[in-house]
């Protein structure tokens, strides 16, 4: 689910923190990708002309494998070295959110049974898509045969992606979930695994610029995310993105915000959930269950051609001609991928206080100019 309204806050208040780029801009970069999120996208988006999922003659779904194979190839073609991270056991606090998802699925199943029009049926069917253990296992087998590394996270995949990025094993974490920022990844890439046909640029969010532009510490930013509503606990009823940011700037922490609301000074406009586990939720962001990135060795190896043909073509009935063509692209891309970026030859020096202040000032100016532009009317010549 991610964090409600966080993207809109960043877009409005710190637009300079989001850079929209073509995939070619990430040539030479290593990226840790949220595998479960990607597989979910593939199961929904990779479809036959009639709208059904791709499958073998015996009914085995193959949309996830088709998506994984060709989207990974696209990254390799553009000089990106992907590493996929799979979810482990969800935190106990997430059980409430998972229960809500189960209830929504049951409701959707009822609507599907009652649906009469084909378009309506298709809409409900897509909402019922779920990544299974079998989907994950098949994707891991495919990646292993392709020579693409993957990591089995002990907990949340986004947290492990952020850990790899923080420790410099990869450049960025890639996920659609905005809560990845709360795990302190230096960069978050969104839309990386989208279909090329969608022509959607990749959104690169710089966490440091976000914090500077919002004038929040990382701890306050995490508290803001929890207040907006995350997978670990409910939000404060009646508090939307605008109010949440205002309260965080005025009070500085969830403890003080809760104290302010419960004191009655807010005229009972908002209600804090009973036994609200915001401190436990905060702990999951600050100290997530991850493998230390220094213990992980990411290796990209040559694809196992014969085994890939056997798996994709003979077992999953993919076109052998297309798979062989894909393998050649994979071999070429992984071979040429050793060429690094120019900035890889230089030591990264931490930004000075003056540089950070300049970045924050630039973000404020961009916000001011954006507001001014909205009020202007362009005359026709």
From Swiss-Prot:
Single GO cellular component term: mitochondrion
Cofactor field: Mg(2+)
Keyword DNA repair: yes
Cofactor info, note text: Binds 2 magnesium ions per subunit. They probably participate in the reaction catalyzed by the enzyme. May bind an additional third magnesium ion after substrate binding.
Annotated spans, N-domain: 1-105
Pfam families per the UniProt record, alphabetical: XPG_I (PF00867), XPG_N (PF00752)
EC identifiers of the protein: 3.1.-.-
Keywords of the record: DNA damage, DNA repair, DNA replication, Endonuclease, Exonuclease, Hydrolase, Magnesium, Metal-binding, Mitochondrion, Nuclease, Nucleus, Phosphoprotein
EC class (word): hydrolase
InterPro entries, per database record: 5-3_exonuclease_C_sf (IPR036279), Flap_endonuc (IPR023426), HhH2 (IPR008918), PIN-like_dom_sf (IPR029060), XPG-I_dom (IPR006086), XPG/Rad2 (IPR006084), XPG_CS (IPR019974), XPG_DNA_repair_N (IPR006085)
SMART domains for the chain: HhH2, XPGI, XPGN
Chain residues that bind Mg(2+) 1: 34, 87, 156, 158
Subunit (UniProt): Interacts with PCNA. Three molecules of FEN1 bind to one PCNA trimer with each molecule binding to one PCNA monomer. PCNA stimulates the nuclease activity without altering cleavage specificity.
Family membership noted in the UniProt record: Belongs to the XPG/RAD2 endonuclease family. FEN1 subfamily.
Protein's recorded name: Flap endonuclease 1
